[in-house]
Amino acid sequence: MNNSNIIIFPEKYPCSISSLLIKDENDVFVLSHQNVLDCLQFQYPYNMYSQNHMLDDIYWTSQELIEDVLKILHLSGISINKYVIYVLVL
């Protein structure tokens, strides 16, 4: 993955993202659990949540977790090439 890492802690599945810590040499960015859900709210099929009920939680398998972390980074405009990504899960 081009000079970057995605580190999942603790590595257990299914899991829910507690937060993402995105770090380079100078900065650290944090996306909270709610930030993650907000980023992904409309990325999932309509039948996963009702129109009047916002997405409360998502439980990921290992492959889904990596794919969605990459989506979140892309939606946030974060270049995967220069960061280490720490995924803290519940």
From Swiss-Prot:
Changing residue 81 to S: In strain: ATCC51908. GO terms for cellular component: host cell cytoplasm. The keyword Plastid does not apply. The keyword Thylakoid does not apply. Keywords: Host cytoplasm, Viral RNA replication. Changing residue 46 to C: In strain: ATCC51908. Changing residue 39 to Y: In strain: ATCC51908. It is found in: Host cytoplasm. Belongs to the orthopneumovirus M2-2 protein family. Mediates the regulatory switch from transcription to RNA replication. Acts late in infection by inhibiting viral transcription and up-regulating RNA replication. Inhibition of transcription by protein M2-2 requires phosphorylation of the phosphoprotein. This is Protein M2-2. It comes from Bovine respiratory syncytial virus (strain A51908) (BRS). The gene is M2-2.
